[in-house]
Every structure is written in C-alpha cells, then in structure tokens.
Amino acid sequence: GFPAVRIMETNENYTQQHQDIRIEDGIAYGDTIEHVNFDYAAKLTSLNAVVLAGMAKAPAPPANVEIRGAVRPSTTLSWDKILGAASYRVHWRLTTSPTWDYSRAVGDVDSFTLENVVIDNYFFGVSSVAEDGSQSPVVFPGPAGSFD
C-alpha cells in the first residue's frame, strides 16, 4: 500500500450532504449550491494545500522503532535512521490524551532515554525531522506503528 491522508469534515449536516435533492415533511434535502460557503471553502483549501505540501516534503518516518523500560524508572526508544532526516523528535503523551502533549528534539541519534518518564503511564513515538524543520508522522514502537 501507499501512505495516505484523508481530509474530512467530521460535523456533517445530513440534510444537506449525502442526500438526493428533495423536499420531505417540509425539509429541503440535498447538496445544493446555496449551502456552499465559498469564503470558508477557499480558506480550507489553502490550509489543506499548505499542510499537504509540508507532509510531502517531510522525510519518511523512522523505521523499526523499539521501546524498552519495563520495571525501570526511565524509557528508552531506538530506531533506524532514515535517509533525508537531519534529526529526530521523541514524543509522548498520557494514555488518556488524544494528542502528543510532550516532545523533545533529540538530534541526529538512533536512540534516546527519557529519564524519569515511566513506560506504564504514556504512549510513545518518534518522528524524523528534515533540515528545514518539516516532520514525518509520529511512529509508535513495534510492528503496528511501522510503514514497512
């Protein structure tokens, strides 16, 4: 397969989207031009283009990310370096958080230990960073996080 990105609206108005044009019980249904907010669509298209361009020029994600730290007070991540990456960033977040709340630039290395960050309390990942600062997606340790 190929890496892919899906850009979507999560708060859809189902009377105006995914409907055949009709009036039912006094409600007008359907995708019609009067419901399009062109200023918003233009801003969203510009934002999407910038984000996708940044993703396209970013280096590939690190490969073979591994984690160690069971029954230790610190957590160590290791990975294979990627051609085109100038450095790497280690990310972690509480297991209840949907976003990467913490990260640390770790340089052009292939492993890093987060001192006094216990493996049991967080999710961890690593991203590759290009010379210009563009960054790959974060990769979780283990086979499930691999793009290979």
Where is each model-derived feature located?
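Secretory-pathway/membrane protein signature
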Residues: 1-148
